[in-house]
Design a protein with these regions (language model features):
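NAD(P)-dependent Rossmann-like dehydrogenase/reductase catalytic/cofactor-binding core
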Residues: 1-8, 17, 59, 149, ...
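NAD(P)+-binding Rossmann beta1-loop-alpha1 motif at the extreme N-terminus of oxidoreductases
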Residues: 1-61, 86, 123-126, 327, ...
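Hydrophobic beta-strand scaffold residues
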Residues: 26, 46, 89, 114-115, ...
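Short beta-strand and adjoining strand-loop segment in the mid-core
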Residues: 27, 127-152, 188-196
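Beta-loop-alpha module in the N-terminal Rossmann-like domain of NAD(P)-dependent dehydrogenases
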Residues: 51, 63-79, 96-99
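Short, well-ordered coil/turn residues at beta-beta hairpins
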Residues: 65-67, 92, 150
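Rossmann-fold NAD(P)-binding glycine/threonine-rich loop
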Residues: 85-88, 92-141
Length: 340
């Protein structure tokens, strides 16, 4: 089957490579000509503009857009100008699901089909496959099924759930038609919100282990210094990288994310290579917003999002104000840096 790919960054290029490895025909375009040439050398058909790109696709044409979120809307609009009724535009980035609903309606007026695909797998997707969460018209999604099946990890990527019998479902192969337009990115949005929460849990737990020797610190015990009492119970020099390593094997909290965490700690045990300013790409905010709209408690996901804000210095004014208030009502003086 043929697919056109617009955007040849790490994920876009690896999607193309995975498709070509399975015998699919790929037409590619990127604003960076070198990215196009690289995939041409691997067997793709290159193009030098969106018009050239569209002209090299067989009808009904399917064009997958995989560009940074800020550019997605503009690129889809420009690609739509080159497409004809019956053609399909796929958004495989991290777009807001509400934009998908509006975009699908706009494209439908032009006779174009729209499919939103939440794509998870990152830089490891070529080897591991990409988990796909899909939104769109049922018949259009079914038409694209051979592409999704190739891109997805496959049923062998995880042990089968106990008591499931019969032929493996698409979900067991790593891709799922979640519903109409917007459903794919809605599910991916919540996936990323959960990711924030899991990451925060690992970070907080391992930080508690990292501070388990706080009782060895010399100093006067007061309400300003931890531990407040019984320092003899906090004398442990825990090897945090090795804890992450042992948890990978047979523990309840084992996961691929923990595998990556263990690798990061092995490379930089004290994490001195990082400043700790944690970005958020939007999905966490959208997830919390959806929880508010639905009236659904999302305490962990909300806290994980707000911690990312704090890591970037967004709480500095509030923290200073807390110190100022303590000084006002109790005469408390701030301790110097490095005091805990």
């Amino acid at each position: 089957m043929q697919l056109g790919m617009v955007g040849l960054g790490r994920m876009g290029a690896n999607l193309v490579r995975r498709l070509m490895r399975d015998g699919h025909d790929c037409v590619v375009f990127d604003v960076n000509p070198e990215s196009v040439r690289q995939l041409e050398s691997e067997g793709a058909t290159g193009s030098n503009s969106l018009a050239d790109f569209a002209s090299k696709l067989s009808k009904p044409r399917a064009g997958w857009v995989m560009v940074p979120a800020a550019l997605t809307g503009r690129v889809i609009d420009e690609l739509a100008e080159q497409m004809e009724p019956g053609d399909i535009i796929i958004d495989g980035g991290n777009s807001y699901y509400r934009d998908d609903v509006d975009r699908a309606a706009e494209l439908k007026e032009k006779g174009l089909h729209f499919v939103d695909v939440g794509t998870s797998g990152g830089v490891f997707g070529f080897e591991r496959g990409f988990c796909l969460m899909i939104g769109g018209e049922k018949d259009v999604v079914e038409h694209l099924d051979p592409l999704f099946k190739t891109i997805a990890p496959g049923v062998e990527s995880a042990p089968r759930t106990p008591d499931r019998t019969g032929p493996p479902s698409p979900a067991e192969n790593g891709y799922l038609h979640c519903g109409p337009n917007g459903a794919g990115h809605f599910v991916k949005m919540v996936h990323n919100g959960i990711e924030y929460g899991i990451m925060a849990s690992y970070a907080e737990g391992l930080n508690i282990l990292n501070k388990a020797n706080v009782g060895k610190k010399q100093g006067e015990i007061s309400a300003e210094i931890t531990p407040l009492r019984e320092p003899q119970y906090y004398m442990y020099d825990i090897n945090v990288p090795e804890v992450a390593e042992v948890w990978r094997r047979g523990s309840v909290v084992a996961s691929w994310l923990l595998d990556l965490t263990a690798h990061a700690l092995f490379l930089s045990p004290d994490l001195s290579d990082f400043q700790g300013r944690v970005s958020d790409s939007g999905e966490g905010r959208w997830t919390v917003g959806a929880a508010v709209d639905e009236g659904v408690p999302a305490l962990v996901l909300s806290a994980a999002l707000f911690e990312r804000f704090s890591s970037r210095g967004e709480a500095i004014f509030a923290d200073r104000l807390l110190s100022a208030m303590r000084k006002e009502f109790g005469g408390h003086i701030e301790l110097g840096p490095g005091t805990s």
